[in-house]
């Protein structure tokens, strides 16, 4: 049910690729078994294997799926400027938005640590940035749905099930409500979110 896994599932749906999903139990250390480490030495989830080609890091997988299987380039346009904005949003999602989620919530969920107010401020700052990016925008990067929207909707929906108040950020909230309607695989994403919700 993690955000990175769900972003890959939605991207696959958007390009019409049927994934043969294998679920690993991280608590039981299945990702550390030699057969998985042989595929992905970094032993991170998600990992994609496509006809013997292994790739990990969800946003890299998203781009690969679109470039290899997309009928058009609309989800990741070839125009360098459009692509640059999408990349910026993907890196923002990875290094700022989703990272703020991991830094604040994971210690509470997995180590039973108390909430860290400083880490919470980083979440608020990340949402302020996203709110600014989305000023007057229907989509996260450009004028149509891209892999940036898919990655961000996976992250933002995770904040929602964790109880974060997205509605405080008007532009994010408006974008998110639209993204729920237009993102392929949203239903599966939300089902994964609800699985994840048990941790909160």
From Swiss-Prot:
Gene3D superfamilies: 1.20.1050.10, Glutaredoxin (3.40.30.10). The keyword Transferase applies. Signal peptide: none annotated. Keywords: Lyase, Transferase. PROSITE patterns: GST_CTER (PS50405), GST_NTER (PS50404). Residues 79-200 form the GST C-terminal domain. Its EC number is 2.5.1.18, 4.5.1.1. Conjugation of reduced glutathione to a wide number of exogenous and endogenous hydrophobic electrophiles. Has DDT dehydrochlorinase activity. This is Glutathione S-transferase 1-1. It comes from Drosophila teissieri (Fruit fly). The lineage of its organism: Eukaryota, Metazoa, Ecdysozoa, Arthropoda, Hexapoda.
């Amino acid at each position: 049910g993690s955000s990175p896994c769900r972003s890959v599932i939605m991207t696959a749906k958007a390009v019409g690729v049927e994934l043969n999903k294998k679920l690993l139990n991280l608590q039981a250390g299945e990702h550390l078994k030699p057969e998985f480490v042989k595929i992905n030495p970094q032993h991170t989830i998600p990992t994609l294997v496509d006809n013997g080609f292994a790739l990990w890091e969800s946003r890299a997988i998203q781009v690969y799926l679109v470039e290899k299987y997309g009928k058009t380039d609309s989800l990741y346009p070839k125009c360098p400027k459009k692509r640059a904005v999408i990349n910026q949003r993907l890196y923002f999602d990875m290094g700022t938005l989703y990272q703020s989620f991991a830094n604040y919530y994971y210690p509470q969920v997995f180590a039973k640590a108390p909430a860290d107010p400083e880490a919470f401020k980083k979440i608020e700052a990340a949402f302020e940035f996203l709110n600014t990016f989305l000023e007057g925008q229907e989509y996260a990067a450009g004028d149509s749905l891209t892999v940036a929207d898919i990655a961000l909707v996976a992250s933002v929906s995770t904040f929602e099930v964790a109880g974060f108040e997205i509605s405080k950020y008007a532009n994010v909230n408006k974008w998110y409500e639209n993204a729920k309607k237009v993102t392929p695989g949203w239903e599966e994403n939300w089902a994964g979110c609800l699985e994840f919700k048990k941790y909160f």
